[in-house]
Amino acid sequence: MALPTPTWARPIGLAFFFLWSLVAGAAANLHVSPVRVELAAGRASVALTVKNDGDTPTVVQTQVVAWSQQNGEDVYTPTNEVLATPPIFTVAPGATQIARVALRREPDAGRELAYRIFLQEVPGPPRPGFQGVQMALRIGIPIFVEAKKPQELKLDWSAHREPGGELRLFLNNVGGKHVQVYDLNISSVENAAPVYSNQSASYVLPGQRRSWLLKPLERQTLSGDRIRVKALTDTGRVETEIVLGKP
């Protein structure tokens, strides 16, 4: 059974933080590095460093899930293909704890595999007299397993105008590895000034498609049917020209 997709808070770097309302106390200040795990046939395990910058001990529970996408939405399912140890641990104030992530299967021959490890703060008892609401931190770290055969990044862009002046932009990842897009700027081929822009970070896994509905920037209009797409990704800058299609 697929796990429900959590409600995301604002991304910080490549790690995503979730705030869950729990009873009493203040959220611990946890920091995890690295913010992305990359495994391969010759690199089957990686150590995560968890640091507690708070003033109280913090109990952390780990969970690894398989990560896929459907209709542009993240889907998480239970898995035993990646193991996180220890599954639960306590980090003293100002101290660090090593959590190890280990691959328990062979990498896929022709496609990158994706998982996430969630590190969930387990709330302790409330301090005497506290009557507030505790915000428990949940950190999601992407895990990617490189395919046995090197994969190229292959992106297929398309777009069309919407009746209200918006632009519907599609990205089809036809390659065998993920891409993270965190900056989009769309302009006419004849004019470099951006007409549409989106700064949010989005992953598109291999074989998946994502779309953005973009509103025009103030006092900007798109001329002609040829547009230039510029994007920043986790593998570098992407720039391409496409012809607008029909809805």
Show which residues each predicted segment covers.
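N-terminal secretory signal peptides that target proteins for export/translocation
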Residues: M1-W8
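Bacterial N-terminal signal peptides
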Residues: P11-V23
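Beta-sheet-dominated interaction scaffolds and their linkers
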Residues: A27-D53, Q151-E166, A201
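Asparagine-centered strand-capping/turn motif at beta-strand->loop junctions
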Residues: V50-G54, F170-G175
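Short, hydrophobic/aromatic beta-strand segments
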Residues: T56-V64, H178-N185
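Short aromatic-acidic-glycine turn motif
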Residues: A66-T79, P126, S187-N198
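Intrinsically disordered, low-complexity Pro/Gly/Ser/Thr-rich segments with frequent PxxP/GP/PP motifs
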Residues: V75-P107, P194-Q220
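Terminal connector regions
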Residues: R105-P150, R219-P247
